[in-house]
Amino acid sequence: MRVYCAKNYEEASTLAADLIAAQILLKPDSVLGLATGSTPIGAYQRLIAKYEAGELDLSQVKTMNLDEYRGLDGENPNGYRYFMNHQLFDHVNIKKENTNVPDGKKDPAQACGEYDAKLERSGGIDLQLLGLGHNGHIGFNEPAEEFSKTTHCVDLSESTIEANARFFDSEDQVPRQAYTM
């Protein structure tokens, strides 16, 4: 694993976009693991700019998103499918059928099992973009949890619910569970 240090958000966003673009150029049918939240938005904006400048072709890329709230569907503005469509997918030439986000409307066993099967069929992730939550969570894997090798349903911590309430009309609307890799 390589560790990169950036001086600020702008530099980190550029570095992340450059690493993702290099992966796509190296392997046009790369499987990218993607994240949501405010951290990756700058990287996504730079990827869009590279695509618009003719420097990047995402037509063969497949994506596997890290997580989704349980109970939300792809049309919900607070859901991560919606987020990814608006922050990246709608602005580049990626095929929507090659973009994958856990199905928040399905029951946990079905949603997680189907997602793991998709991941296995994809051949695995070539490059994973991650962000760290305010309390150190990765995806929705809270710091006190043991990592799982499979997609699973987790109870969100109160601190995560409080932090994510800014994206909802009220804290009561924040789902209490999520599916995460």
Where are these regions (language model features)?
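Glycine-rich N-terminal segment of FAD-binding domains in flavoprotein oxidoreductases
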Residues: 26-52
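Class I SAM-dependent methyltransferase SAM-binding "motif I" and its flanking Rossmann-like core
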Residues: 139-181
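Generic structural signal for well-ordered alpha-helical scaffold segments
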Residues: 17-25, 48, 52, 85-89, ...
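A glycine- and small-aliphatic-rich helix-loop capping segment at beta-alpha/alpha-beta transitions
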Residues: 46-57, 80, 143-153
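Glycine-rich phosphate-binding loop
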Residues: 123-148
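Ligand-binding beta-strand-loop-alpha-helix segment within the catalytic cores
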Residues: 56-128
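N-terminal glycine-/serine-/threonine-rich phosphate-binding loop
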Residues: 1-32
